[in-house]
Amino acid sequence: MQFTTIASLFAAAGLAAAAPLESRQDTASCPVTTEGDYVWKISEFYGRKPEGTYYNSLGFNIKATNGGTLDFTCSAQADKLEDHKWYSCGENSFMDFSFDSDRSGLLLKQKVSDDITYVATATLPNYCRAGGNGPKDFVCQGVADAYITLVTLPKSS
């Protein structure tokens, strides 16, 4: 019986040793569309967290990737910017945004007409550092560009 047990252990060890280990493919990334008629580049993210937990101002640049002229800064300021709330990108822009600070998630909405509204979303990676207006004051800055693809918002049924 001991021989059978020992032989089984050696056989299992031999099978385990025969299977080559491969390193995980950490450098592989999903392809991201970076240009097109409905693709916009989001860059230059900035924000301020006066108490370290919420934003009171944030903004980012939106630029067309198809050679178009769209290139402007979208921003909002308030005593406390609320998550899950729409803020206008500016007068006559027909664009609004919402930002989820816990995941750095941007939701953008463009009203094209009464019948057509486009939406898009992206994660805006950023880094926050001491802001200088107190121990809990943080200034945040984007660390990478993001690209969004506008899709038509379905009508409610």
From Swiss-Prot:
CDD domains per UniProt: Alt_A1
Cellular localisation: Spore wall; Secreted
Gene3D superfamilies assigned: 2.40.350.20
Annotated InterPro entries: AltA1 (IPR032382)
Keywords for this protein: Allergen, Disulfide bond, Secreted, Signal
Keyword Nucleotide-binding: no
Chief subcellular location: other
Tree of life domain: Eukaryota
S-S bonds: 74-89, 128-140
Signal sequence range: 1-18
GO CC annotation terms, alphabetical: ascospore wall; extracellular region
AA1-like domain boundaries: 35-153
Oligomer status and interactors: Homodimer; disulfide-linked.
Role played: May bind and inhibit the beta-glucanase activity of host plant thaumatin-like proteins.
Family: Belongs to the ALTA1 family.
Protein name (Swiss-Prot/TrEMBL): Major allergen Alt a 1
Organism of this sequence: Alternaria alternata (Alternaria rot fungus)
